[in-house]
Swiss-Prot record:
This is Sorting nexin-4. It comes from the Eukaryota. The PX domain binds phosphatidylinositol 3-phosphate which is necessary for peripheral membrane localization. Pfam families: PX. The gene is Snx4. GO terms for cellular component: cytoplasmic dynein complex; early endosome; early endosome membrane; plasma membrane; presynaptic endosome; SNARE complex.
Length: 450
């Protein structure tokens, strides 16, 4: 008889992988010969090939934000922010950068681009977008998404998103990403023509696979748990930072009272007046310095927020793997059931209770011709099922191989970026404390001269 189907637990196992390098700040994607282009992992996405745009070093920047008013899909007036994307070639003959393209994009178009990338590159940890509305704010920080300071931080975040995509070894070659940077008119139509919405996995299907998969890959299970814990840790860190910022702001501003009191005191003193006046001035400078300090802190908070949102990108890769594993297990079960049914027809023995067995007892046995016809149909279905299982197995192996390579690349990037951000934050705190020491040292000298 036919051999038993392979164990789904052992199907999606990759070989040893070499980690890839992390992204840089400038797009540098070298594309091979004109006819080299293939479709990425059979997903049906044309990679960028034979285009001189990618053969040069390109600087990408989101240089400006502008508030605009227009009509939305239901013909209602709305206010939104548009962002100016500029791409420049930095390999000009005289060494100067040359503007090649500039166009305006809304935040919703950035979202559309990322959703497309998530569907067509499910094995990639797709870079996240900056927050659409402010989170983890302290009382002085506005939660309004039209606030100029928030819009500026989001502009920086959108530029960082484009640089992340442009420096990714796979995403940078995508045709839709290229058109996002260069095609101002009808870009949405170009994206929708790819039909990516139809290929997106439903949330219900993904949730079903999460709970019903029988043999999940332990590495992806651990990765999902890690992403949950990473998100939790960074969330708590950002909440602590917001509370500290609130209190620090109050402490610094209260020092302004020193300045006012010293100034009032200096008015009634003759010999001590100048010293008190100078000390009060130093206290005023100290009190006002907190605004710039906390503005700089927001930069480091945004770096942490990026990896807060990266946690969801990691989970998206895990969900896709669970879906593929669940489909593989379902195909293996269907194949095993058909083989058992074929064996029962061939031997005339029924190993388990079935409706067919009951009808046979009630209405009599099938004729040999009917049995042979059913066996033939089942054998054809078994052959198709084996081919389908083999195809799903190969697809799953390729997904695991590519996904794990990108996860290793992401880990290197994460370790490097977070290390740099935390060190820079510590240096900034040290600098802030030194400035405080300097203020009080100056005040001491003022008191000494009285």
């Amino acid at each position: 008889m036919e051999q038993a189907p392979p164990d789904p637990e052992k199907l999606l196992q990759p070989g040893p992988l070499e980690p890839l390098g992390g992204p840089g700040a400038v797009l540098e994607a070298a594309v091979g010969e004109e006819n080299e282009g293939t479709r990425e992992d059979g997903s049906g996405v044309d990679t960028m090939t034979g285009n001189n745009f990618w053969l040069k070093k390109i600087e990408i920047s989101v240089s400006e934000a502008e508030k605009r008013t227009g009509r939305n899909a239901v013909n209602m007036q709305e206010t939104y922010t548009a962002y100016l994307i500029e791409t420049r070639s930095v390999e000009h003959a005289d060494g100067q950068s040359v503007l090649t393209d500039s166009l305006w994009r809304r935040y919703s178009e950035f979202e559309l681009l990322r959703n497309y990338l998530l569907v067509y590159y499910p094995h990639v940890v797709v870079p996240p977008l900056p927050e659409k509305r402010a989170e983890f704010v302290w009382h002085k920080l506005s939660a309004d998404n039209m606030d100029p300071d928030f819009v500026e931080r989001r502009r920086v975040g959108l530029e960082n998103f484009l640089l992340r995509v442009a420096s990714h070894p796979v995403l940078c070659r995508d045709k839709i990403f290229y058109s996002f940077l260069t095609q101002e008119g009808n870009w949405k139509e170009t994206v929708n023509e790819t039909g990516f919405q139809l290929k997106a996995d439903s949330r219900l299907k993904a949730l079903n696979a999460t709970f019903r998969v029988k043999n999940p890959d332990k590495r992806f299970t651990e990765l999902r748990h890690y992403s949950d814990e990473l998100q939790s840790v960074i969330s708590h860190l950002l909440r602590v930072r917001a509370r500290v910022a609130d209190r620090l702001y109050g402490v610094y501003k209260v020092h302004g009272n020193y300045g006012r009191v010293f100034s009032e005191w200096s008015a009634i003193e003759k010999e001590m007046g100048d010293g008190l006046q100078s000390a009060g001035h130093h206290m005023d400078v100290y009190a006002s310095s907190i605004d710039d300090i906390l503005e700089d802190e927001e930069h480091y908070a945004d770096q942490l927020k990026e990896y807060l949102f990266y946690a969801e990108a990691l989970r998206a890769v895990c969900r896709k793997h669970e879906l593929m594993q669940y489909d593989l297990e379902t195909a293996a079960q269907d194949l095993a059931a058909k083989k058992q049914q074929c064996e029962e027809l061939a031997t005339g023995t029924v190993r388990t209770f079935s409706l067919k067995g009951m009808t046979t007892k009630l209405f009599g046995q099938e004729t040999p011709e009917q049995r042979e016809a059913r066996i033939k149909v089942l054998e054809e279905q078994i052959n198709e099922g084996e081919q389908q299982l083999k195809s799903k197995n190969l697809e799953g192996r390729e997904f695991v191989k590519n996904a794990w390579a990108d996860i290793e690349r992401f880990k290197e990037q994460k370790n490097r970026d977070l290390k740099e951000a935390l060190i820079s934050y510590a240096v900034m705190q040290i600098s802030m404390c030194k400035k405080g020491i300097q203020v009080w040292t100056n005040a001491k000298e003022c008191f000494s001269k009285m």
